[in-house]
Amino acid sequence: MIDDSSLTAEMEEEESPATTIVPREPPKIQRLEESVVNRIAAGEVIQRPVSAVKELVENSLDADSSSISVVVKDGGLKLIQVSDDGHGIRREDLPILCERHTTSKLTKFEDLFSLSSMGFRGEALASMTYVAHVTVTTITKGQIHGYRVSYRDGVMEHEPKACAAVKGTQIMVENLFYNMIARRKTLQNSADDYGKIVDLLSRMAIHYNNVSFSCRKHGAVKADVHSVVSPSRLDSIRSVYGVSVAKNLMKVEVSSCDSSGCTFDMEGFISNSNYVAKKTILVLFINDRLVECSALKRAIEIVYAATLPKASKPFVYMSINLPREHVDINIHPTKKEVSLLNQEIIIEMIQSEVEVKLRNANDTRTFQEQKVEYIQSTLTSQKSDSPVSQKPSGQKTQKVPVNKMVRTDSSDPAGRLHAFLQPKPQSLPDKVSSLSVVRSSVRQRRNPKETADLSSVQELIAGVDSCCHPGMLETVRNCTYVGMADDVFALVQYNTHLYLANVVNLSKELMYQQTLRRFAHFNAIQLSDPAPLSELILLALKEEDLDPGNDTKDDLKERIAEMNTELLKEKAEMLEEYFSVHIDSSANLSRLPVILDQYTPDMDRVPEFLLCLGNDVEWEDEKSCFQGVSAAIGNFYAMHPPLLPNPSGDGIQFYSKRGESSQEKSDLEGNVDMEDNLDQDLLSDAENAWAQREWSIQHVLFPSMRLFLKPPASMASNGTFVKVASLEKLYKIFERC
């Protein structure tokens, strides 16, 4: 028998050396050598060959050059040569030319706010000398000869030597990153780096149309970029990007000078709906400085997503001018980003103008004509229950029995062209912005390839996939829409069977699954007027009240509405980030997510949606929270019957005028014209709502179901699908089909 105490003692002895913590002296802080500091800084400023070209070209522009030539070898690693015809560099300035923080652009920090030049830090040339071999040849106006000098680690390797030169400056950067082995190994794709240099100079050429640019590979005769001085910016775009781009551009201008301090001018060119490209090209200059702005790019892409066909991307050139004190240019080592005062307002105004311009120009489109050879289509299926099967060549095709013959095809249903004949409403709804109306005509997109990183969302998606019913999935993928049987059920055909399908249940499940799969990747529907949460929630509470005449409950309803409003305000950041449900600081709802790109939910159900978020979501547990919010969104976006009764059949009585005079007249005459006794405005709204719902069910819901829906096993038994007929049984009764 083993003694427990001795065993415990032995274990403690074995573990004690591992748990002993040896005191350690804190490391000594040392001052880095200046050469180390300079090399680290050089790696930040000159990140790849295109960074060096950008700095050198900007220096040439600061020198009032009218012609700039760039020669590149091995993507810029072997050689970068930039020549210009600017004012040159004085002989007495050459000794300190490549020292850090030496510049002719400013003398004190306050000069940053009135700076008109590209460079200002005095770091670019210095950084190049720490990671490459730099040679400068220059001559100023009036000099008899020029000077050439080489630099290394910020200092001259020798005194300037007299040489023959043409007006301006030529800077050669050789063996870039020769002393940074890791950086050099990551830049072995010379074609990629040269492409970035060509793209940079192309962008520069269309903005600085008063300067001639050229770029070619070392030893090449033909230049890959060659622009000439042109009075028209559109001509510059045509010469650089080609006629196919220039002919599809529209001019756009925006300006603002309000009392709040948002002052700017923007002019540029944007592509129309006939332009087709696979990548967005945004050429953005702010105060004549080439920069990037991801927020502006994203805002423009959202507008174009509603108008461009397929996955096409736009071409956009914009030049924005602001007061120099409104721009902070000193926020990035390579100066590719700037910070703007009132940036969000500026982006919103530009986005609105682009949207208006596109909407006004979207009346006509150009399509390529192509001859179509009509061939006989055959239906093939590998399923055992399919009435038609594919036979090897050379064998006689077996005749399909008449009682199993299917004349429909789910991939080419009858009436598919109706999707392009959606009637436009006479007036836009007040609750949804015009952008969402434009977006409603967009064809179905695929879900984002990136999935959410959160394990809770991945578990929810995995749960949806694991509960999928294979038989129901096959039915959903290959069914054909027949028509609406009533307000809730649609008739669908699958092979030789006819089913009733509950469109409310199907759409609710589809929207729930889409919310999970598009988690944190939503586009947004902008409401034209922000809606106060408290009023909407209070309205939902009153609609649920079974005793509306009881005023004693009003205080309780108001308190519940206030509590839910505060709760949603508290969760606003999470709702915005993950679900694109935007609630501002004043507790107003201003944006909703796009679950299906062709579909806008019934805005009359917003109060019910907000109340559901407040009452039915378990906010404390992450997985339960995301599931509850997704379920609430799924129920809100589900294709419920409109609140107005269906005017077909008995529902028409709801729209009768209830005026006393008309009722008396009806009683007296007995045969008054029914049309004269109807509220035509209300009837028209109802007819439009029901027609829009049926169109959405046929052309949005069912195509999206075939792409995205994973029907759960519960749908096989809860009445979502009900089999009503089959060709085999009908043939037994009628002996014909």
From Swiss-Prot:
Keywords: DNA damage, DNA repair, Nucleus
Bias kind Polar residues: ranges: 378-400
Keyword rRNA-binding: no
Annotated region described as Disordered, given as residue ranges: 1-21, 378-416
Compartment(s) where it occurs, according to its Swiss-Prot or TrEMBL record: Nucleus
Superkingdom classification of source: Eukaryota
GO biological process: one example: mismatch repair
PROSITE patterns reported for this sequence: DNA_MISMATCH_REPAIR_1 (PS00058)
Pfam families registered for this protein in UniProt: DNA_mis_repair, HATPase_c_3, Mlh1_C
Function noted in UniProt: Involved in DNA mismatch repair (MMR), correcting insertion-deletion loops (IDLs) resulting from DNA replication, DNA damage or from recombination events between non-identical sequences during meiosis. Component of the MutLbeta heterodimer, which probably forms a ternary complex with the MutSbeta heterodimer that initially recognizes the DNA mismatches. This complex is thought to be responsible for directing the downstream MMR events, including strand discrimination, excision, and resynthesis.
Family: Belongs to the DNA mismatch repair MutL/HexB family.
Name of the protein: DNA mismatch repair protein MLH1
Annotated organism of origin: Arabidopsis thaliana
